[in-house]
Amino acid sequence: MRVKEFHVLKDVNDLLLFATKQRKLFHEAKVVVYKNSGYNQDELMVLRDAYGFGTDKDLSINYEVHYWDIYNGIEDGPHEFINPWHLESNYLEHPPVSGIWEMTSYGLGGGEGGFIDMGRLYEKLPDDLKEYAENTYTVSLPNWFPIDREHFRKVVGTSNRPFLYPVNDPAPGGFPGQQYVNVFPHPLVQEHPVTGQKVIRTITELPVGDFGQQREIYLDDSDMKGEFTGWLNQELSNPENQMWLEWGRGDVVLIDLFSVCHSVKWLEEKEDEPQRVLQNQLWFEPGAK
């Protein structure tokens, strides 16, 4: 699988003339890139409108990721991934549906971003695991917050009701001053709010044991859980399911965040300075608060 690359238009407003076709291509590809586009903020908002991601009122998150902070915050492991395959903000009641990512700066160290279509993996599920997944609720730990996992498990219990969880001293990438997060258990399989496609909505460890912690709590902790997570990790490890993109400065990526999980890995030695910065703009389901 490959990330689909679109031609960089001299006048990005031309996209609005064939927005219906572009949206169809996007929902088929799930991840598209405009290489070294040089698009400014106004032009990125034209992309948003052309692909139907939302409006000014729907823009819910706008933030930067400094990869140096992330790299230094994670202990060196026996593998090349600096974070496991994950879905964005999977603990929220309304997780992000669409996103525009722009690599605003890029240093000497090489790296790649990886993507996997979780809707495609749902279609590959064996019948017994598909039945299990469609009837199971899970709770994702709020990403980037240092959490007492044993206490978190006790708070979750076996209820699928939402709850508030206190957080202290957010890790790099967190939100300073935030005292708690609202956590929502959700079905393991959900329908995409735009396309209606069924999607496996989970975060998992890859390789197994990454961080030494499990980032997902299954409310159905039967033997089927082990069968399901074993199958899922095997599929996530399969290169045939992975799409990889070598980042460069000025690259703009449009991503179906509801359907696609992602990861990051380094190819070369890490840099001496924090020069690799990714600007994120995420949109939720229209009307979701």
Predicted feature descriptions by range:
Residues 2-249, 258-289:
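Non-heme Fe(II) oxygenase catalytic core, chiefly the N-lobe of the double-stranded beta-helix
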Residues 254-256:
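Short beta-strand segments
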